[in-house]
Amino acid sequence: MVEAAARKGVTIEVVTFDESTHTAAEAAHALGAELGQIVKSLVFVSGGADDLEPILCLVSGVNRVDLARLAAVCGLPDVRRATAREADELTGFTIGGIPPIGHIRRLRVIMDPDLGRYEVVWAAAGLPTAVFPVPPATLRVLADANVAPIAEVTAAPSPGGGRSVVVEPASAPGRPATGTTG
């Protein structure tokens, strides 16, 4: 993984921990970072058992992937979460340590735009106890990622009651929420 970054002219510094950083919450706690700064590397697949097309989603730690949005972004009729075995076979890494780069094969990579809210984000470095810091723009280049809205959209209760406002996940402070009322 470090070599994959070096081939693109980027030096990354891996930080290791005694405790697990397997989940986004564990990583944020260990780093003293915001949950949104943690990059979840999630593997999804499309196709049949003999011809799986892997899709790696780089998602802000506060967000969840919306399968319908991901399928639409990828132009695929059906997408599902990869099993742990499929993720390992398709990337060469186990869940909890899947990095955004350095996989055993080329993957289609989609990046959550909410990661761009931060100067630095933290991504897995190949083990459940290792991460590395990287600016989101550099991450996009390293992973050859397409940035697209793939996160679930949540409905927040309206202060007036009865009506709800659809809010894009992780709206930045001071930035108006997008969506509709109804």
Located regions from the model:
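Extended, low-hydrophobicity, polar/charged segments
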Residues: 1-182
